[in-house]
Amino acid sequence: MNVLLMAYGTPYAPEEVEPYYTDIRRGRRPSEELLKELAERYEAIGKSPLNEITLAQAVRLQALLNLEAPPYPKRLLGPFPPRAPHGPARVYVGTKHWHPSIGEAVAAMHEDGVRRAVAIVAAPHYSLRSVAEYREKVDSALKTLPEPIDFVWVESYEAHPGLIAAYARRLEEVIWRLKNPGKAAYVFTAHSIPLSAVEKGDPYPRQVEKTAELIAKKLALPRFHVAYQSAGRTPEPWLGPDINELLRTLKEEGYEEVAVQAVGFPADHLEVFYDLDLEAQATARELGLRLLRARSLNADLDYIQVLKDLVEAAWPR
């Protein structure tokens, strides 16, 4: 069993910010002003752990795929070694905008003799601006190979019961810390996308809403809101409401506390640490709101079990 696990990627050092964002901007170098702002954001959070988390996800996913326990015997007569029902599993990491790139990962897979694999992005919602672009990069990499690799795609998993349970457990931790639950709002966030993508029928907002709805139902929340964050610096309109705008609305409606969960971001990275923990938190303090964020899934085993389930279900029989 072979797996290509993909994530966005992040620079490791300040000098890598420029080539990283040049790649995001499809070869267009950021202006000096924008570059300075981006560098200051990374400096403010210290460092984005996204690459390390993605690697940990891959290591743990490979371990789970290879260490499936046999059925429990009626009588324990001795050690029962783990078994790998589909043969040894290998999980490769490819990042969209840094190293190892998706192209580098696909080339390594081919060199290792891989001819079929499951492709999955460490993000639960499909979008023309996310998963579809990962797929384009894989397709471009395949064109450079002398022989093809047959990829089976896991394109979204917004309603997977294990994912919902994992998110619900972490939000419940925040609920227990609320001082006045009757005056608390529950907000689920995801990365914004251009409205032009939504107008083309992008299922992304529906999938984000579905995840939020299922978590709220599992926890019997009386109400919930969906907000978007981290909109791009482009003239075109982006999907809203923005988290900071929503916080102002919630204050006007009389809420005192806000429990936030970033359901669009399983792993900690710049847009969690800066856009939520610094920027949104500053907005909340300015408004007199108490904001608490649920911890991320990262490489925790309950999330890795979700990835394992998805990979095994997709693997060709």
From Swiss-Prot:
It catalyses: heme b + 2 H(+) = protoporphyrin IX + Fe(2+). It is an enzyme of class 4 (lyase). It is found in: Cytoplasm. Gene3D superfamilies: 3.40.50.1400. Pathway: Porphyrin-containing compound metabolism; protoheme biosynthesis; protoheme from protoporphyrin-IX: step 1/1. Keywords: Cytoplasm, Heme biosynthesis, Iron, Lyase, Metal-binding, Porphyrin biosynthesis. Fe cation binds at H191, E271. One of its GO terms (molecular function) is metal ion binding. The keyword Lipoprotein does not apply. Catalyzes the ferrous insertion into protoporphyrin IX. HAMAP family: Ferrochelatase. Belongs to the ferrochelatase family. This is Ferrochelatase. The gene is hemH.
